[in-house]
Amino acid sequence: MGARRLGRELALQMLYSRDYAAGEAAPLLELVLDESEPGAAAGRSFADDLVRGVLEHRQEIDTAITGASKNWSIGRMARVDLSILRMAMYELLFRSDIPKNVTINEAIEVAKKFGTEDSPAFINGILDEIASTLPDKG
């Protein structure tokens, strides 16, 4: 598994856990990271960036998700799906070094692993809607 995929999976676990536990996300990283995993250091760094970015820009991210999710309030979304969407939205809006299609594809792959059967299509629909309104990166 690549370092960024590992980072996304770690970030998802931290964001999901943070929704249910008050406090900082950093201690959660220690619980979900296997230091022996290849790419662990780079994955940790990327996960940390994603989590901090989502937390810093959460209001703007949630506003964008709400605008693109027809008939779905954030409160009705599955927590795993919402955490994946928040991560991907941070990448789409604030990480110019990651192409839009990579962000969307990675979010779908993470959703296949951690979400429900319907999660990949749900996440793809919302991210495609948002990505179509954003300028190309590069």
Curated annotation (Swiss-Prot):
An MF annotation (GO) of this entry: RNA binding
Pfam families: NusB
Protein family membership: Belongs to the NusB family.
Function: Involved in transcription antitermination. Required for transcription of ribosomal RNA (rRNA) genes. Binds specifically to the boxA antiterminator sequence of the ribosomal RNA (rrn) operons.
Gene that encodes the chain: nusB
Xref: PANTHER family: ANTITERMINATION NUSB DOMAIN-CONTAINING PROTEIN, N UTILIZATION SUBSTANCE PROTEIN B-RELATED
InterPro entries: NusB-like_sf, NusB_fam, NusB_RsmB_TIM44
NCBIfam families the record matches: nusB (TIGR01951)
Domain of life: Bacteria
ATP-binding as UniProt keyword: no
Keywords: RNA-binding, Transcription, Transcription antitermination, Transcription regulation
Protein name, UniProt field: Transcription antitermination protein NusB
Record flagged with keyword Transcription regulation: yes
Organism listed in the record: Geobacter sulfurreducens (strain ATCC 51573 / DSM 12127 / PCA)
GO cellular component, one term: cytosol
Disulphide-bridged cysteine pairs: none
Sections of the chain in a coiled coil: none
GO biological process: DNA-templated transcription termination; transcription antitermination
